[in-house]
Structure formats: structure tokens, C-alpha cells
Amino acid sequence: MLDYFSLAALAAVVREGSFERAARALHVTPSAVSQRIRLLEERMGCALVVRGQPCQATETGRRLCQHMDRV
């Protein structure tokens, strides 16, 4: 089951390019964003974000972000 808050964290990281800026946009801590993404990656069984500066979505991450935009 994909939950809204995890998908929102993924979309924010991809949009903002960093966990820290995504956390500010979502009004949570960077560790909360990281934990949500990690749990989502575990559920999906693959990496969703390439960590770096800037953070970028993998192909699967991009598809999930597109799904999030439609929901």
C-alpha cells in the first residue's frame, strides 16, 4: 500500500532537489523525509531517488511522481 505522505515526500525531494529543502516545504524534519522515502523504497523493492546534489528520481521514482500528480 502506498501512502500519501510517502508519495508527497518523494515528490517534494524530486521537485526541490534535496531532502533538506523538501523537509522545509513539508514542514517536517529531513530525517522524517528520509525515513518515508526509505520505507517507500523498501515497499517498492528498488531505489526511487539518486541521492546527491541535486537529488534526482530514478525511472521508477519519476513514474511514482507522475502518479502522485494525477492523484
Task: List the predicted regions and their residue ranges.
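Short, basic-rich loop-to-helix N-cap that marks the start of a DNA-contacting helix
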Residues: 1-5, 56-62
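A short LG(V/I)-centered, amphipathic sequence patch enriched
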Residues: 41-57
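Short helix-boundary/capping micro-motifs
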Residues: 12-27
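Alpha-helical linker/hinge and terminal dimerization helices associated
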Residues: 7, 43-44, 64-71
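Alpha-helical residues within the helix-turn-helix
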Residues: 24, 42, 62
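Conserved hydrophobic/aromatic "anchor" residues
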Residues: 7-10, 19, 49
